[in-house]
A protein has these predicted regions:
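Periplasmic-binding protein-like
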Residues: 29-40, 97-100, 131, 152-164, ...
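Short helix-capping segments at alpha-helix termini
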Residues: 4-5, 54, 119-126, 151-153, ...
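Hinge/beta->alpha junction and helix N-cap segments in small-molecule ligand-binding domains
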Residues: 11-20, 63, 73-83, 99-146, ...
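Short acidic capping loops at alpha-helix termini that bridge into adjacent secondary structure
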Residues: 94-95, 125-130, 180-186
């Protein structure tokens, strides 16, 4: 889409390295880039200060930060967390762990809030939940699964933030003789095609990343042509896709 507008995209991967992100923003500003589409922003004072200094238009994708007001294209992460918990509750689950990703990012915190509020719709004493934080890696998924198994697998269902963590969890569960979903149900907030390489048919709460990217590019085009008179916030609704990884334990 950027190429169709006659623009050359420069892709920078920070792997959530704060110093690298800030240097990339400064590079874009120094070299008079036409815009920054920022996917990995996290709430921190130094990032906000860097963004305030830049003259380059900034669009945040799938997140916002409280300390810097700018254009955003986001999934409704609160709703996504709520949908996930309610789906598991409707399938009879009352003991559910949420394996989140990076702590402190607005998508994660909004998703956790939605998840917790759905769980708290149940009568007090009828539910148990716990939030574990990760780093979006297979290794963290392996680690969480081992910890849960060591503790006697106290949950019947896991709501997992992304496919990498989910793959790590499933691999470790299978190695230890657990069956998905017979022994443990898994619902993922990510529908990456990468997961298909592992033969997994995970139920997911998902969104269309192509739509998010296209919307961000459209906002950038409007900024370039001075067609945006105010800050724009676009919220996209997540969808539940049911596959084979959630057991309806009401039928047991």
């Amino acid at each position: 889409l950027l190429l169709a507008l006659g623009l050359l995209p420069v892709v920078c991967n920070s792997n959530y390295n704060a110093d690298l992100e800030e240097s990339q923003i400064e590079m874009a500003d120094t070299n008079n880039y036409l815009g920054i589409i920022f996917v990995t922003a996290t709430e921190r004072p130094t990032l906000a200060a860097t963004l305030y200094r830049t003259n380059t238009p900034v669009i945040l994708v799938n997140r916002y930060i409280h300390s810097f007001e700018t254009h955003t294209v986001c999934i409704d992460n609160y709703k996504g967390g709520y949908i996930a918990a309610m789906h598991l509750i409707e399938k009879g689950h009352r003991r559910i762990a949420h394996i989140a990703s990076y702590k402190g990012t607005t998508p994660q915190m909004d998703r956790i809030q939605g998840f917790q509020e759905a769980m708290q719709c149940l009568p007090r004493g009828e539910y148990r939940y716990q939030v574990y934080f990760g780093d979006g890696t297979l290794e963290r998924g392996n680690q969480v699964a081992r910890e849960l198994i060591k503790n006697g697998m106290p949950y019947t269902a896991l709501f997992v933030a992304d496919c990498q963590i989910a793959i790590g969890i499933v691999n470790t569960l299978r190695e230890q003789g657990f069956r998905v979903p017979t022994d443990v149900s898994i619902l993922c907030f990510d529908d990456s095609p990468y997961i298909n390489q592992y033969g997994l048919r995970l139920s997911t709460v998902t969104y269309n990343p192509l739509s998010m990217g296209a919307t961000a590019v459209d906002l950038l085009a409007q900024l370039m042509s001075d067609r945006l008179s105010s800050i724009s916030h676009v919220n996209l609704t997540p969808q539940l896709i049911q596959r084979d990884s959630v057991m309806d334990i009401n039928k047991r």
